[in-house]
A protein has these predicted regions:
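Extracellular and organelle-lumenal recognition/adhesion modules and their flexible linkers in secreted
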Residues: 71-340, 358-360, 375-389, 432, ...
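Conserved, mostly hydrophobic/aromatic
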Residues: 93, 192, 285, 352, ...
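Surface beta-strand/loop "capping" patches
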Residues: 116, 184-186, 609-656, 663
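Solvent-exposed strand-to-loop "edge" motifs in beta-rich extracellular domains
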Residues: 193-198, 236-238, 604, 654-656, ...
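An active-site-proximal structural segment forming one wall of the substrate-binding cleft
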Residues: 235-238, 244-245, 266-286, 340-355, ...
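Active-site groove signature of glycoside hydrolases
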Residues: 251, 292-295, 365, 370, ...
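Catalytic-core region of carbohydrate-active enzymes that cleave or remodel glycosidic bonds
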Residues: 351, 448-449, 455-458, 479-484, ...
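C-terminal beta-sandwich/jelly-roll accessory domains of carbohydrate-active enzymes
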Residues: 621-631, 654-732
Length: 732
């Protein structure tokens, strides 16, 4: 070996082997050779035993370029006595139809404006002005009609009429949402409601066309009779194309009326949702699923709020609704972004059941979006306290829809839709980001009505949009009112930078243990740095790492924090209004962000009981060190849980610093530490804090699970090293 290829150590004696001092770091791959070389020099059995015992620890220290001196080792103590139970709802997901998250995203429909109701405008008084060919191209003689419609709440349809010349064509063309993504060999299910205009049958031809305007596959469909009927055809794509589109031609001279023109991928989950996006959700192992918002629950005005009763029943007759996110940000304007309600409350409940999460539907409290309406206009834009009954009935009827017997009105509808068994709804949110006196005076009536009829139903209230708004006064007022009203949980939202997240690692340590519990319903770390010029560019590793740090505070305070959901959930790379987001999609695929993997690691390692984890800290001027939670001192955050089902201790360590940290973890209550030979560690790490995963490069930052190298045990003390810029989950 050459000198320049080694780490050099001073070894005064075998006793001091563990106190080796790194003199010079060169090529890491020669470290193991060095150990064997030293073994040949020091022909000492005791040394060999000791080296075997400490091999991984010293190797890890060398690889990380840190010294193994005793004064560098942080002394942490974990009390192995199980503490507060961790709720099954602790880590979950929140869905809102923003960033084309539903239509154009999770909802697998490929056709935009399939019922010819867009553009749609809803006046503040509730008048609907709808019907049009938005997102459709027409050629030949195409008319928009509404006489004798197939569906009363979606009355518009098109009539295809022969153009009168054999060389001319009549038809319609739809490019979906930023194109239609089709995959080679996959079947696509076309359907349409049609009727013939004349005495004889009509005929249409359906084509899938690629981005180069070449027809990939086509099918002919006969339309018979003057009554509306549903017709279907299967189209198998011969190749993959992210920007395909669909054409429907009239063949022959007989005219046809067409409505609800639809195209779904054959692999859609339950024939409804995009399979890969559903799998992304299931793989998160969420405990709670909050839906459908968010700001769309409120609406820019109440006439455009999300109304759950319009989102259930026959999908073809669910009326189109505005989506406030199509015009909220003028620099990200998407005029054709509406809510088809194809993904409605019934589908949300089905999805909750499939992914194993408790449903948390959120309903309007009688207030339009307070961001978009001034308090001075309250009497005009909001429902008065005396006129809330319709809104209260919506809440009571929703519970009946979810849980009621099939003998009830809404329970029967659930059964008719295909789910006679109840969904076992346990909680309901009333209001989104509400604040000030307008909210509690309305919520009070909801709580009284719900508790009178469904006393076991948990009610989630709101603390407003921001814990720091107006110096925190609005937030404090919201909490005071929720406590006074007896809400079961209070929803907190925060979108802040890295510094805020670090300062708030201990946020819940001082919360009252009495009264409502915490639901961190919307949160994400928004980086202060300029993001990379890609849609996914704000979902950087550093943001995820700081979220992981803050979540140690959620876990440590499991007796207070009962639920937490990152926001937003989905975003289309060509149609986003808000970022960062947990999962990015295009027309063909998805990418899981570093933030996704943080959520997944917590949700897959929740434990059953929180454990007290502290570090002895000497305060300035103090004579004695005091045990304190590990909440960011020198860049380290930590929490621990016990999983009684697996018999495992799970320790989460987040090192946001630039240097590796050596830790001696005492298992208080045990005479001997768990077997470290079988310990595992899953790490999320990047040397580049601005690293992110993209549609093109999905695996820049991904977790790695392995046997816990570098871990040693002495009596009830385990020694390990957490690399710089790393989130590590240890299982003992």
């Amino acid at each position: 070996m050459q000198k320049e290829n080694l780490f050099f150590f001073s070894f005064p004696s075998a006793k001091n082997f563990g106190e080796a001092r790194v003199i010079k770091k060169l090529q890491k791959e020669h470290i193991i050779k060095l150990f064997y070389y030293l073994c040949t020099i020091y022909d000492n059995t005791k040394l060999l035993i000791m080296m075997k015992k400490h091999l991984y620890a010293t190797l890890a220290a060398c690889l990380l370029g840190v010294s193994a001196t005793a004064q560098d080792v942080r002394q942490l103590t974990m009390n192995t006595k199980p503490g507060a139970p961790i709720q099954s709802t602790m880590y979950g997901i929140f869905f809102e139809d923003i960033n084309f998250g539903a239509d154009g995203g999770l909802y697998a429909e490929l056709v935009s404006n399939r019922s010819f109701e867009a553009p749609l405008h809803i006046t503040p008084a509730g008048q609907r002005i709808s019907g049009g060919l938005m997102d459709w191209k027409t050629f030949g003689n195409v008319q928009l009609n509404s006489e004798n419609p197939a569906f009363s709440r979606n009355p518009h349809y098109v009539t295809l009429i022969d153009d009168g010349h054999r060389e001319k064509q009549t038809g319609i063309e739809n490019h979906g949402y930023f194109g239609m993504g089709v995959k080679k060999g996959l079947k696509y299910d076309f359907s349409v409601y049609g009727r013939a205009r004349g005495a004889e049958d009509a005929r249409i031809r359906v084509e899938l066309v690629d981005a180069n305007n070449e027809v990939m596959v086509k099918k002919t469909v006969n339309i018979s009779g003057k009554e509306w009927k549903r017709y279907t055809a299967e189209l198998t794509s011969p190749r993959t194309d992210a920007k395909a589109f669909m054409r429907v031609y009239l063949e022959g001279k007989n005219s046809a009326d067409l409505d609800h023109v639809s195209l779904f991928p054959g692999d859609a989950w339950q024939g409804i949702l995009r399979a890969d996006m559903v799998q992304d959700l299931k793989d998160l192992h969420p405990g709670v699923f909050r839906f459908p918002g968010g700001c769309i629950v409120e609406g820019t005005d109440l006439a455009s709020r999300y109304q759950w009763k319009e989102s259930v029943g026959q999908v073809e007759n669910r009326p189109l609704n505005e989506n406030r996110w199509n015009y909220t940000f003028p620099h990200r304007l998407f005029p054709s972004y509406f809510q088809s309600y194809g993904l409605g409350f019934y589908e949300f409940f089905l999805l909750s059941e499939y992914i194993g999460a408790q449903a948390l539907p959120v309903l309007n409290v009688g207030l339009a979006c307070q961001y978009q309406n001034d308090d001075k206009d309250a009497a005009r834009v909001h429902v008065s306290v005396d006129d809330l009954q319709q809104y209260i009935d919506d809440a009571l009827d929703l519970i009946e829809f979810a849980n009621g017997s099939t003998d009830t009105k809404w329970g029967k509808l659930r059964a008719d839709m295909g789910h006679p068994a109840p969904f076992n709804l346990k909680q309901i949110g009333v209001g989104n980001e509400q604040w000030g006196p307008l909210y509690p005076e309305r919520l009070k009536k909801f709580i009284a009505a719900i508790r009178a009829k469904y006393p076991q139903m948990k009610i989630v209230g709101s603390s407003g949009p921001d814990p720091d708004d107006k110096g925190g006064k609005q937030f404090s007022y919201g909490w005071e009112q929720m406590t006074k009203l007896g809400a079961d949980l209070v929803d907190e939202h925060y979108y802040r930078n890295q510094e805020w997240f670090m300062k708030n690692v201990a946020r819940y340590d001082g919360y009252s243990r009495k009264g409502p519990k915490v639901f961190a319903g919307e949160y994400a770390c928004h980086i202060k740095e300029k993001p990379a010029p890609t849609p996914e560019g704000m979902n950087v590793f550093d943001a995820a790492l700081h979220e992981a740090a803050a979540m140690t505070g959620f876990e440590r305070n499991a007796d207070v924090v009962h639920m937490a959901t990152y926001a937003p959930l989905f975003a289309h790379v060509e149609g986003w209004q808000w970022r960062p987001d947990l999962i990015w999609v295009d027309n063909l695929t998805t990418v899981r962000t570093p933030n996704y993997y943080v959520q997944q690691l917590y949700a897959m390692n929740p434990g059953t009981n929180v454990l007290t984890l502290t570090e002895d800290v000497m305060a300035p001027g103090a004579k004695k060190a005091k045990a304190q939670p590990v909440t960011g001192q020198d860049g380290l955050c930590a929490s621990a849980v016990y999983d009684k089902n697996a018999g495992k201790y799970i320790v989460k360590l987040v090192n946001v610093g630039d240097k590796a940290q050596q830790i001696a973890l005492t298992f208080k209550g045990l005479k001997v530490a768990p077997d470290v030979e079988n310990a595992t560690v899953t790490t999320l790490h990047s040397d580049n804090p601005m690293a992110c995963n993209t549609i093109q490069k999905k695996s820049v930052v991904v977790p790695t699970e392995m046997k816990a190298m570098g871990v040693t045990a002495e009596k009830n003390v385990v020694t390990l090293t957490v690399p710089a810029k790393t989130f590590a989950v240890y299982k003992f």
